[in-house]
Amino acid sequence: MKTMTSAEVRQMFLDFFKSKGHTVEPSQSLVPVNDPTLLWINSGVATLKKYFDGSVVPENPRLTNAQKAIRTNDIENVGKTARHHTMFEMLGNFSIGDYFRNEAIAFAWELLTSSEWFEFPAEKLYITYYPADKDTYNRWVEVGVDPTHLVPIEDNFWEIGAGPSGPDTEIFFDRGEIYDPEHVGLKLLAEDIENDRYIEIWNIVLSQFNANPAIPRSEYPELPQKNIDTGMGLERMVCIIQGGKTNFDTDLFLPIIREIEKLSGKTYSPDSENMSFKVIADHIRSLSFAIGDGALPGNEGRGYVLRRLLRRAVMHGKKLGIQGKFLASLVPTVGKIMQSYYPEVLEKEDFIMQIIDREEETFNRTIDAGQKLIDELLVNLKAEGKDRIEGADIFRLYDTYGFPVELTEELAEDEGFKIEHEGFKVAMKAQQDRARAAVVKGGSMGAQNETLSSIEVDSKFLYEDKKAQAKLLVAIKDDELVDEVTGKAQLVFDVTPFYAEMGGQVADHGVIKNADGQVVATVLDVQHAPHGQNLHSVETISPLKVGETYTLEIDEERRSAVVKNHTATHLLHAALHNIVGNHALQAGSLNEVEFLRFDFTHFAQVSKEELAEIERQVNEVIWQSLKVETIETYIATAKEMGAMALFGEKYGKNVRVVKIGDYSIELCGGTHTQTTSEIGLFKIIKEEGIGSGVRRIIAVTGQKAYEAFKDAENTLSEVAGLVKAPQASQIVAKVSNLQDELKAAQKENDALAGKLAASQSDEIFKNVQRAGSVSFIASQVTVPDAKGLRNLADIWKQKELSDILVLVATIGEKVSLLVASKSLDVKAGNLVKELAPFVDGRGGGKPDMAMAGGSNAAGIPELLTAVAEKLG
């Protein structure tokens, strides 16, 4: 077995399959593109689903990749086990209807055992297979595997409901008896017992059958196109090759761990658990790559996952004794480890560090709040005579504030408290179940559409034409190829002026005419077929026949509106880079007839000043009437030109570059104006957040922009009339004067309210009652607003008349309730929650002051009567 670095292992895998005629697919963003079923790219095949379901046919049916992936179902296990990670790399080879079982098994055995490649000892490799899959067993024997190393496993069958399925065969490496102290041997593998001796390194899925839950598995029909999907975990391979005790004891993690040693002053040893070292090393990899790919910490979805990872890493840093912020300082080390194949971390190092640093600073403030919560919880439990912390409270501290259970235990034990673990486990399982339920299971191989996949004719899009003579090559009705169609159908022509929806630009609409100039069909939509042809969805008026020539005409007015928005989108993207920063990467776009929508990564709301500057800059470029050039060239040449490639998009060798003067240059396959002046005008309508770290701008161009400006002008005129400003330029001064007058009136009103409260207070505060050892005042009062209640409470505080004050008032149709407390035994927030239901209300607050709102004034007498009972 050869000694290799992780970079060499990755490259050898790719080089091997390249030598076998495979195309190397570049690693895609961790943030899925156009796949709502996934929170993250979670496997090597996840980015290739379009090939397996037949929606796109690859240029080469043999593919290989090294794909970064994230899985966070069991974050708690990271650091506890030898091989659990949140971010990992999958190496894979894939066949889309090309080779199958025989070649896949032969490739695997050659790569692993040949002296030219990894050179693993054959006697160290064990293979599992599906018992009924005799073909796989026989093939392994044919390539040279010792039959005693072949282990049948009933679970070796890949299946997710109805659809493509098939047996799989897994390859394990035997690390020897040193990792099998009980000398259990092959039983560990045969009975699927968790162990550190037999390590799975490769899984080969043979997608062979069309699963149907209604029939026995043995009767599943075979798929028309059989596929191969394999996955090899890079971290596991490197661990075996480098002889690490765990995956963390390799060149993928050790440089990070060495930096953590410097920060903490503590020493990592593979012979001890060192959980905190492993957690930090794992989580900083995930954070660096995910943030580099455009995901940002937040309170939901991907953002919540990143926030949780960061907080967990910070807390483990504190367990190691690291003071202050430290996580961002590890990013350069992550970048250097991975730079040979993933240069993006170093390229975006400053931005990644900025985000992590800012988030860590925020969390450090949160930690202080969490510490106070723990202290407060322990004080309350002591006061109640309890000696244990309930599981629900532990989970709240863990889930909301990121406190590891171990840290809560330590703090509790220092104060003599026990921990109720069962409640924590129940709450944790409920959260995991919710997380799993939120992800729609998407199999690696979706349903195959044979009709569309079988179409292999050429179909060319004519960029410059609005009308074209075209021969009808293919007609599809109800998923069947036909020679003549009526009603709704799908058509493919040899050429077309109709743009198929792609890259955020909507499809063209229009009509199809016969030789006599009569309209025979309306084009409702255009999409790309699996082999890339332009597939026209039409509603026919008269029958259309395959082989005949028709005139295709697009709706030019619609196209004109769409291209204005598309070209403006390029200008907006460039302006965002200039004004907000280069981290503002496109996260989605839509170029419609009425408007354009642009989503981009950014960690804060775009300020009004920034939006104004973006709008000004885009319009300035429009008025310069810059030429919009399209250049067809090689991808390498385009990148040398500085063309911006959109992350997550897949580009072939030949690409189309759209260049707008010296202002913008992007890879783009869409249609555009000839000059920027054709856009006319650009106006931003809205800027908003649509998810964690993703902002959205909606804008309009041309006539729609003019209408938007006109609407704003009309609104301004209406406001001028309301404030009696003769000219629009005087509105600001008029409104400012009105605000000053309003403040003066409010001040006078507050003074009167204070006097009213003082006049009422003597009468209200006369009736001091007792409930046990607690004195209280409970009264219904007349006040204009909630502030009046607070004024009375302020007077009560100064006079020190009782321990508790309860005031209730009807304000309009609503009920307002105030509770104030000077007693350490009675918390206002708790008492207001008990009283509010009497008036159909709810509320809360601090231990000394709390308020609630309700809707049932009829419940006020009962509420006041209940105060003594609640305090007694």
From Swiss-Prot:
GO molecular function list: alanine-tRNA ligase activity; aminoacyl-tRNA deacylase activity; ATP binding; catalytic activity, acting on a protein; transferase activity; tRNA binding; zinc ion binding
Annotated EC: 6.1.1.7
Signal peptide boundaries: none
UniProt subcellular location: Cytoplasm
Major localisation: cytoplasm
Needed cofactors: Zn(2+)
InterPro entries documented for this protein: aa-tRNA-synth_II (IPR006195), aa-tRNA-synth_II/BPL/LPL (IPR045864), Ala-tRNA-lgiase_IIc (IPR002318), Ala-tRNA-ligase_IIc_anticod-bd (IPR018162), Ala-tRNA-synth_IIc_core (IPR018165), Ala-tRNA-synth_IIc_N (IPR018164), Ala-tRNA_ligase (IPR050058), Ala_tRNA_ligase_euk/bac (IPR023033)
Ligand binding (Zn(2+)): H566, H570, C668, H672
SMART domains, per the entry: tRNA_SAD
Residue stretches in coiled coil: none
Cellular component GO terms held in the UniProt record: cytosol
GO biological process, alphabetically ordered: alanyl-tRNA aminoacylation
Keywords: Aminoacyl-tRNA synthetase, ATP-binding, Cytoplasm, Ligase, Metal-binding, Nucleotide-binding, Protein biosynthesis, RNA-binding, tRNA-binding, Zinc
Cofactor binding, note field: Binds 1 zinc ion per subunit.
Superkingdom of the source species: Bacteria
Reactions the enzyme catalyzes: tRNA(Ala) + L-alanine + ATP = L-alanyl-tRNA(Ala) + AMP + diphosphate
Family membership noted in the UniProt record: Belongs to the class-II aminoacyl-tRNA synthetase family.
Comment text on domains: Consists of three domains; the N-terminal catalytic domain, the editing domain and the C-terminal C-Ala domain. The editing domain removes incorrectly charged amino acids, while the C-Ala domain, along with tRNA(Ala), serves as a bridge to cooperatively bring together the editing and aminoacylation centers thus stimulating deacylation of misacylated tRNAs.
PANTHER family for this protein: ALANINE--TRNA LIGASE, CYTOPLASMIC, ALANYL-TRNA SYNTHETASE
Task performed by this protein: Catalyzes the attachment of alanine to tRNA(Ala) in a two-step reaction: alanine is first activated by ATP to form Ala-AMP and then transferred to the acceptor end of tRNA(Ala). Also edits incorrectly charged Ser-tRNA(Ala) and Gly-tRNA(Ala) via its editing domain.
Name of the protein in question: Alanine--tRNA ligase
Organism this protein belongs to: Lactococcus lactis subsp. cremoris (strain MG1363)
Gene that encodes the chain: alaS
